[in-house]
UniProtKB/Swiss-Prot annotation:
Protein name: Periplasmic nitrate reductase
Gene Ontology biological-process annotations: cellular respiration; Mo-molybdopterin cofactor biosynthetic process; nitrate assimilation
Organism from which the protein derives: Dechloromonas aromatica (strain RCB)
Coiled coil: none
Lineage: Bacteria, Pseudomonadati, Pseudomonadota, Betaproteobacteria, Rhodocyclales
Residue numbers spanned by region Disordered: 308-329
Residues binding [4Fe-4S] cluster: 44, 47, 51, 79
């Protein structure tokens, strides 16, 4: 059957309509003649919005992409990055063969990168990993993964590290972007991920953006908000940030606040709601508990830092070796105690602290307080990359819970994601150093036991100790605690904090062996010892999970160039190099004698569950190189085993094949029907008739409102370093620019990073627009041009620098302070000075 793009769209219209209702129908055949473009659906490779695209291939190459008009998320639209997806795989410097640092024919830490075979690459990885385990045990190994991994890549990595090598030293780069959202959800609701969905946009009367420049970072969702506002009189938009950006163009209530004072603003809103008698008392009485948390929790810096030495509840070892308190500890309080706690956050006090006018604070609070106004709160990195990021998430939930504006169309607190599968892979699969699939954690013995049973492993296989998180991994490499480190699908040497002091030294430490899997020679790759060339996006069969709990699949469309192989294949092949006796203690092997002599591949992947789907089940007319090389339908096997964790436990995923037929489905998918709103009767299958609202993540079915104070940041401007620095993204580039800077049109649109600065700050320093300047912190310095006009307009005393530019590494300047609960880095607040070169 031959289909052009128009015919393909028509043929799938019915499928899209039915799948939107949670049903599935057979997918259209899309086999093409040699001379025609073949079109097939995929999820966009960039942000967490999860736009649908149509991928056009011809002669083994992606030649075009289009917005998918049948995709519910974007309805045929793509942002500027999405329109150029067809070019991201074809940069001139695409890696096609493994590269090892060598000198005189041997590996040398200071040698030149030299092409080698995959066999030799795995030989040296095996040698270095085994030497590390012999010297340091399994915790000498670490892997840093990604919210860009496909679902099955993350799941395979989690099995390999946590069960195979028996270390929880696995963390995703989502630690840098979504960990605070995870911790916030778990503390307030006992279960992760948003209760609402994008359909909320078409029902809302007001939108509040907290530290989220949706106009540039989630532009397709922004078009839906814009349409809602311009098409419906009375719809309001409030925007809060530390500097003005493009989202302010639509704002009815624009607010610029002093960094960190969002905590105080959130408490003021709660106080306003209470003082004005706008608490939904019936909702609160039935559905909410109140708690007060530990507050002297430090800033996630090294234990020797002055800010950590005196902290009483940062969890670090005290002189007696015991942890100093618990960063997440909380105790019950009453509503009256909460009322008294927030009463100090008056409009006068908060206006003075934050710099936001009293009238704007009142207008914002009234949006939440008015029972007739449906409100969505959107946030991204402004909340999450915050030394009190977990608290910020909790405080926003407080407001929605006090008013009952939650879990129904148009009323939703909504944490947006920045990566295409930060939800689907990092969070749901559980590739964090403390997590297992379906919101389980490694410290819970019942969770470990359940996981071991599903994986067919002896009890005690999974260690009970939380592994190193992202920032701790860097410190462990520097300190010599980790000697073997494998990074896949991210560019942490550019994206991680405090590069000069905490990242680079560990990578170049002589005894450490660093492996980077990437399609391109990134900053990370060039700092590594071994580079593995990686297949990307539609060069493999994949699955992502977006910010609204929508799981989306795509088929392999083209082959990867040269010898490039997927992250999944790399994990599989590496696992074949180790027998259980080499990595497990004898007493563990003795519990399962049938596993003796088997490789980790045999035990984890060829285990009778993952390998039960045959090659003839893969899609006809499409390549599936991973499955062909491995010998069975690996993607289906991994997915179905993984899905067994969530089915019946509030994380239900549909059968594998249905995702290839639908434009994504939002979990929980029960009885073939997706869930749009969680926790409310009539929408959520886990809320029984008569229960109304039930936050079933907690055993008592209630959510928690937390009493949490405003606290200052870890570092603020002073006489020497007199300006705030905030980092982030721009519309044209994504993260570190690995893909977007290799698209000529995107590169030309914004070729180099600049320092956005208030004109008066520039003038006071004798600087002019376009002038080259030095921006320095206590940790490093970079040179770049001054920009006093354009899209980003900082207030006096603050500068903004995007992090996409490999030639201007802004993370040389940033501080490696984190939220002590979530361990997420604060990239939004440190002190710098700007001087003329």
């Amino acid at each position: 059957m031959k289909l052009n793009r128009r015919d393909f769209i028509k043929a799938n219209a019915a499928a899209a309509a039915i799948s939107a209702a949670g049903l599935s129908v057979p997918g259209a055949a899309v086999a093409q003649g040699k001379d025609e473009i073949r079109w097939d659906k995929a999820a966009c490779r960039f942000c967490g919005t999860g736009c649908g695209v149509l991928v056009g291939t011809q002669d083994g190459r992606v030649v075009a992409t289009q917005g998918d008009p049948d995709a519910p998320v974007n309805r045929g639209l793509n942002c500027i990055k999405g329109y150029f997806l067809s070019k991201i795989m074809y940069g001139a410097d695409r890696l096609k063969t493994p590269m090892l640092r060598m000198k005189d024919g041997k590996y040398d830490k200071n040698g030149e990168f030299t092409p080698i075979s995959w066999t030799k690459a795995f030989d040296i990885m095996e040698e270095k990993a085994k030497a590390t385990m012999k010297a340091k045990g399994p915790n000498g190994l670490a892997m840093f993964g990604s919210g860009q991994w496909t679902i099955w890549e993350g799941y395979a990595a989690s099995k390999l590290m946590k069960a195979g090598f028996r270390t929880n030293n696995l963390d995703p780069n989502a630690r840098h972007c979504m960990a605070s959202a995870v911790a916030g959800f778990m503390r307030t609701f006992g279960i992760d991920e948003p209760m609402g969905c994008y359909d909320d946009i078409e029902h809302a009367d007001a939108f509040v953006l907290w530290g989220s420049n949706m106009a540039e970072m989630h532009p397709i969702l922004w078009t839906r908000i814009t349409d809602r506002k311009l098409s419906n009189k009375g719809v309001k938009v409030a925007v809060l940030s530390t500097f003005e950006h493009r989202s302010y163009e639509l704002a009815d209530i624009p607010m610029i606040f002093t960094p960190q004072t969002d905590l105080a603003i959130l408490n003021y809103i709660a106080n306003y709601i209470i003082q004005n008698g706008k608490v939904n008392q019936a909702f609160v009485d039935k559905n909410v508990n109140f708690k007060k948390s530990a507050t002297d929790i430090g800033y996630g810096l090294r234990p020797t830092h002055a800010l950590e030495k005196n902290a009483t509840s940062n969890g670090y070892p005290d002189a007696d070796g015991k942890p100093k308190g618990d960063t997440g500890k909380s105790d019950p309080i009453t509503f009256d105690e909460f009322k008294k706690f927030v009463s100090e956050y008056t409009v006068e006090k908060v206006s003075k602290l934050s710099g936001v006018a009293e009238k704007d604070l009142k207008a914002l609070a009234e949006l939440y307080a008015d029972p007739k106004v449906k409100v969505i709160s959107f946030w991204t990195m402004g909340f999450n990359q915050h030394t009190r990021g977990t608290w910020a998430n909790n405080l926003c939930y407080n407001i929605h819970l006090l008013t009952g504006k939650i879990s129904e169309p148009g009323n939703s607190p909504f944490s947006l994601t920045g990566q295409p599968s930060a939800c689907g892979t990092a969070r749901e699969v559980g590739t964090f150093s403390h997590r297992l699939p379906a919101d389980m954690v490694v410290t819970n013995p019942e969770h470990r036991k359940h996981t071991e049973e599903l994986w067919g492993l002896p009890e005690g296989t999974i260690p009970d100790k939380v592994g190193y998180h992202a920032v701790a991994m860097a410190r462990a490499l520097k300190d010599g605690k980790v000697n073997f480190y494998w990074q896949q699908c991210n560019n942490n040497m550019q994206a991680g904090p405090n590069i000069n002091e905490e990242l680079y030294p560990g990578w170049r430490k002589p005894e450490n062996f660093i492996v980077v899997s990437d399609p391109y020679p990134t900053v990370s790759a060039m700092a590594a010892d071994l580079i593995l060339p990686t297949a990307m996006w539609v060069e493999k069969e994949g699955a992502y999970g977006n910010a609204e709990r929508r799981t989306q699949f795509w088929r392999q469309q083209v082959k990867a160039p040269g010898e490039a192989r997927s992250d999944l294949w790399q994990l599989m092949e590496f696992s074949k190099r180790f027998k259980v006796e080499e990595v497990w203690p004898a007493e563990l092997v003795a519990k399962a004698p049938k596993l003796k002599g088997k490789t980790l591949f045999d035990v984890l992947y060829a285990n009778g569950v993952v390998n039960k789907y045959k090659l003839n089940e893969t899609a006809a007319g499409f390549d599936n190189d991973d499955s062909k090389l491995i010998g069975f339908y690996i993607q289906k096997g991994l997915f179905e085993e993984y899905a067994s964790f969530g089915r019946g436990h509030g994380h239900d995923l549909a059968p594998f094949d249905s995702y290839h037929q639908a434009r994504g489905l939002r979990w929980p998918v029960v009885g073939g029907k997706e869930t749009l709103w969680r926790f409310r009767e009539g929408y959520d299958p886990y809320v029984k008739k008569g229960e109304g609202v039930k936050f079933y993540g907690h055993k008592d079915g209630k959510a928690v409102i937390f009493a949490l104070p405003y606290q200052p940041p870890a570092e603020s401007p002073d006489k020497e370093f007199d300006m705030w620095l905030s980092t982030g993204r721009v519309l044209e580039h994504w993260h570190t620019g690995t893909m977007t800077r290799r698209v000529p049109e995107l590169y030309k649109a914004f070729p180099d990073a600049v320092v956005f600065m208030h004109p008066d700050d520039a003038k006071a320093r004798g600087l002019q627009r376009g002038m080259e300047v030095k921006v320095a912190s206590r940790r490093g310095e970079i040179q770049l041009r001054v920009e006093t006009r354009g899209r980003n307009k900082p207030p006096r005393g603050l500068v903004f620098i995007p992090f996409f530019d490999a030639g201007r590494l802004v993370n040389k300047l940033t501080l490696d302070a984190t939220c002590p609960i979530s361990k997420e880095t604060d990239y939004k607040k440190c002190a710098v000075k700007v001087t003329k070169v």
